A protein has these predicted regions:
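Transmembrane helix segments
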Residues: 69-73, 184-230
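Junction motif at the cytosolic side of a transmembrane helix
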Residues: 2-15, 19, 244-248, 255-279
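Short alpha-helical transmembrane interface motifs in multi-pass membrane proteins
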Residues: 22-25, 48-52, 95-100, 131, ...
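Transmembrane helix-loop junction
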Residues: 68-73, 108, 117, 121, ...
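Hydrophobic alpha-helical transmembrane segments of multi-pass membrane transport proteins
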Residues: 62-67, 83-154, 174-175, 179, ...
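Membrane-interfacial helix-loop-helix junctions in multi-pass membrane proteins
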Residues: 45, 76-77, 157, 208-265
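Aromatic- and glycine-rich beta-strand/loop motifs that create alpha-glucan
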Residues: 17-59
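Alpha-helical transmembrane segments and their short interhelical loops
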Residues: 125-200, 248-272
């Protein structure tokens, strides 16, 4: 027996089912939320790999004690007199060198294909990059606090008071965040993590040591003092010293902030554009 199903005219002329379109646009609020989620991912990486905190925990303690007891007597005739010169310099040196890790870890993640997996997720593509930089701010804060604590243990008493120390710490963290955009660009465009680290250290070590972070700039040759006026780390060190020791707001602070804003304005778009081409 054959069953015949009648087809009504309405069914024959029914419009085909449409598949709803999904927008690829992600708003600013969602991008910010995704960035903080990726920053949290970066903090979880630190939790599961605590050895990555070596540079912001052991280094401030080791360098502060080492420089204080090795050079204190030679430069300032006593460790106590050397600490007002040393502690702000160590803070800048530790945090700025920590910013190099940003580029190195970005390159490692890209080599492992981590960002390739992010492409399949409904998140803002730039959130992986911005989240990594936000997570590093926690590292900068930890290094800053530890350096101050070690200095206090050694006998350093900042004449600028609590306010001067806090403002100096915030300035150093902000400036280092700005510098991290440079290393983010190097990390995204570099060919290997080792190469990124080598380039970064080759640039940062001379700039840090010639900035007067550990010795008075007045003892340097005239030509080196002249070069220092084009060294951004020099202004960071002087601004930190003036804030921590006198709570003074001078042109060094202005140049540090203006320079940091300029670095972000130039290198953040370049890093984002390079990342978007490769992510």
């Amino acid at each position: 027996m054959t069953t015949i199903t009648a087809t009504t005219p309405a069914a024959r002329h029914a419009a085909p089912a449409t598949i709803p379109e999904v927008s690829n646009h992600i708003g600013v609020a969602k991008t910010v939320a995704n960035s903080f989620t990726m920053a949290y991912r970066g903090l979880l990486k630190l939790k599961h790999n605590p050895e990555q905190l070596f540079d912001v925990t052991v280094q401030p303690i080791l360098f502060t004690a080492l420089f204080a007891y090795l050079f204190g007597g030679a430069i300032s005739h006593s460790v106590h007199d050397y600490l007002p010169l040393l502690i702000p310099g160590i803070m800048v040196q530790t945090v700025v060198l920590t910013s190099v890790v940003t580029g190195t870890q970005l390159r490692e993640d890209m080599d492992k294909g981590v960002f390739d997996r992010f492409k399949s997720l409904p998140i803002a593509r730039i959130s992986a990059l911005s989240g990594a930089l936000l997570a590093d701010v926690v590292r900068y804060t930890l290094a800053t606090v530890l350096t101050v604590v070690v200095g206090l243990i050694l006998g350093y008493r900042p004449e600028g008071g609590f306010a001067g120390v806090v403002v100096a710490g915030l300035v150093i963290i902000f400036c280092s965040f700005a510098v991290s955009w440079i290393w983010a660009l190097v990390g995204v465009t570099g060919k290997s993590a080792a190469g990124v680290q080598g380039i970064s250290m080759m640039i940062m070590f001379p700039l840090t040591f010639m900035s007067g972070a550990f010795v008075p700039v007045s003892t340097m040759p005239g030509w080196l003092q002249g070069i220092n006026h084009a060294n951004p780390i020099y202004y960071m060190v002087n601004a930190a010293r003036e804030l921590m020791n006198n709570n003074a707001y001078t042109s060094n602070l202005v140049w540090s902030l203006v320079g940091s804003v300029a670095v972000i304005a130039v290198f953040a778009p370049l890093a984002l554009r390079a990342y978007m081409r490769r992510a």
